[in-house]
Amino acid sequence: MSDILTKIEAYKREEIAAAKRERPLAAIEAIAREASPPRGFVKALRAKHAAGDYGLIAEIKKASPSKGLIRADFDPSALARAYEAGGAACLSVLTDTPSFQGSLDYLVAARAAVSLPALRKDFMYDTYQVVEARAHGADCILIIMAALDDAEAKDIEDAAFDLGMDVLLEVHDAPELERALKLRSPMVGVNNRNLRTFEVTLATSEALAPLIPKDRLMVGESGIFTPADLARLARVGMSTFLVGESLMRQQDVAAATRALLARAA
């Protein structure tokens, strides 16, 4: 496991323990049961594909460990509306505070502002976080294969499916992909950022895409800035993309989203 993930796991496990003390599992489960039903995340992406469009998972991200503050003018509700107006299929909302200045409150606000399904983008180590995600309205969660062993990944995926949520399995190399393909989720994301070096290259997606079965929904993540980047990944069979930083830096987010999704005539 990379140094960055080791540090993140340490503070995450402290966060989880504190959350359990403040709000025991039974209490958060009761809230999750009363939450509005999950909006189909995979379903929304497949609907875009059926219409001949790219499926964009548009990310609401204030900051990152590698780039620092990304957007000072940060209004999750307004950003969600801009993404929806720009043609995004789904939202991804960072809820990790120490590294990304995220918050579960941002997830609640963003989802309430639109009809799009939302992913809780965070580092998941415990099924408690899955229930917590659903209690705050999340329709999908992220499993980072580099952060978990096979048993942990299965437990977290099972917990999400039990709550009617979708799961994005994130991989960065062939061994992680092999492990992810043993799980049930149809959605496999290839992170073009190496979590050990933070180097980003679209060649990662190009190398792994041919290894992903055609019945899986492939997602390209990180390093995607232009329509040319989307076209490059589309050539290896990807039609779903998770994009955050490049859109977060734009003054007119809706227009930037539309421009990114515009296919060459």
UniProtKB/Swiss-Prot annotation:
GO terms for molecular function: indole-3-glycerol-phosphate synthase activity; phosphoribosylanthranilate isomerase activity. It comes from the Bacteria. Pfam families: IGPS. Its EC number is 4.1.1.48. One of its GO terms (biological process) is L-tryptophan biosynthetic process. Keywords: Amino-acid biosynthesis, Aromatic amino acid biosynthesis, Decarboxylase, Lyase, Tryptophan biosynthesis. It catalyses: 1-(2-carboxyphenylamino)-1-deoxy-D-ribulose 5-phosphate + H(+) = (1S,2R)-1-C-(indol-3-yl)glycerol 3-phosphate + CO2 + H2O. Pathway: Amino-acid biosynthesis; L-tryptophan biosynthesis; L-tryptophan from chorismate: step 4/5. InterPro entries: Aldolase_TIM, Indole-3-glycerol_P_synth, Indole-3-glycerol_P_synth_dom, Indole-3-GlycerolPSynthase_CS, RibuloseP-bd_barrel. The keyword Amino-acid biosynthesis applies. Belongs to the TrpC family. This is Indole-3-glycerol phosphate synthase. It comes from Rhodopseudomonas palustris (strain TIE-1).
